[in-house]
């Protein structure tokens, strides 16, 4: 097994559980045995939490959580944790303000990501802007969130910011789509000098001939910088006679030009099979949104939404997952910037 390095701050208190001796899954990812870590009715007025993002913060952990309110409208709530497993969810929605400090609340907000770039945290979510569109807010303290310009025109979802600038620019993945439930979708990458004006749009990768991701794909957790490239966990969707099935996939993008796919795993890494993934408000969903990872040990904790009803936690080791992706890689001519390599 090759030695792979991770370039990020160490997180010695990363949540962790060793792989069970009786785990026979092909991919080196295993579920936390006490899943789901967040169940139904986790806070007053919130029926379900799922598809949420978490980060280390001042020795503890903070997250932005998609909460389905009891009126059915999704919004984003803050949560705090000592161990990144047991979460205290605020009963109050995040209060967004504009750059003048005036309240500026989206009509609804869902599927957030949370990424630190330099000394600023960026929350990214899907909202209504004449249809499904990307919203962004910045924060220094994870208490006050200042909204900034929407990066793209509608319709777009699944925006994921890279954790550092590349060649002096912010870099973000997104998935252009329609305003409905989107029976299509490829991952694109865009650049910005200031988080306001976005351009240099490039195609990264699309759906594949593998059945588990034959309908559409979308970005998941923020990419992890490694010596092999950017490690990306994403979701792939298949269509069945019983509806969509969302699984977790893995790819490695070029470190300097992330529109280039170096490796893309032909197999899913995690697919619905536990009760909390197969049964829920939207059945058969594993939807990755965040990782907590420790550069010293190579431990990676993956947070994913389960059946649009719960939050699940899974684990892997950097060396093992990179080796698995590389040894099961199929990169097609439809992947990368302009459809050829």
Where are these regions (language model features)?
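Catalytic core of Fe(II)/2-oxoglutarate
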Residues: 221
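Beta-rich carbohydrate-recognition and catalytic domains
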Residues: 1-107, 115-215, 224-284, 295-299, ...
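C-terminal substrate/ligand-recognition segments
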Residues: 289, 293
């Amino acid at each position: 097994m090759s030695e792979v390095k991770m370039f990020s701050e160490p997180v010695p208190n990363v949540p962790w559980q060793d792989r069970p001796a009786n785990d026979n899954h092909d991919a080196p990812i295993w579920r936390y045995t006490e899943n789901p870590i967040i169940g139904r009715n986790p806070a007053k007025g919130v029926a379900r939490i799922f598809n949420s993002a978490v980060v280390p913060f001042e020795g503890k952990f903070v997250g932005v959580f998609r909460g389905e309110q009891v009126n059915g409208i999704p919004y984003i709530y803050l949560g705090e944790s000592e161990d990144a497993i047991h979460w205290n969810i605020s009963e109050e929605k995040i209060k967004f303000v504009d750059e003048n400090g005036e309240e500026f609340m989206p009509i609804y907000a869902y599927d957030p990501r949370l990424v630190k770039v330099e000394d600023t945290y960026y929350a990214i979510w899907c909202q209504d802007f004449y249809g499904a569109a990307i919203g962004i807010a910045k924060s220094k303290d994870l208490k006050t969130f200042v909204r900034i310009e929407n990066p793209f025109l509608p319709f777009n979802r699944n925006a994921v910011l890279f954790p550092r600038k590349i060649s002096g620019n912010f870099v973000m993945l997104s998935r252009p789509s329609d305003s409905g439930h989107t029976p299509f979708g490829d991952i694109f990458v865009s650049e910005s000098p200031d988080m306001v004006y976005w351009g240099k749009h490039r195609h990264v990768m699309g759906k594949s001939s593998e059945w588990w991701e034959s309908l559409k794909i979308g970005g998941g957790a923020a990419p992890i910088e490694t010596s092999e490239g950017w490690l990306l966990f994403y979701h792939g969707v298949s269509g069945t006679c019983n509806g969509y099935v969302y699984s977790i996939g893995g790819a490695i993008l070029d470190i300097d030009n992330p529109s280039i796919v170096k490796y893309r795993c032909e197999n899913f890494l995690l697919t619905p099979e536990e009760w909390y993934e197969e049964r829920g408000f939207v059945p058969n969903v594993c939807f990755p949104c965040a990782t907590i990872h420790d550069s010293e040990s190579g431990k990676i904790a993956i947070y994913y939404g389960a059946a649009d009803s719960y939050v699940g936690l899974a684990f892997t080791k950097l060396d093992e997952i990179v080796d698995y992706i590389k040894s099961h890689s199929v990169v097609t001519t439809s992947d990368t910037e302009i459809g050829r390599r």
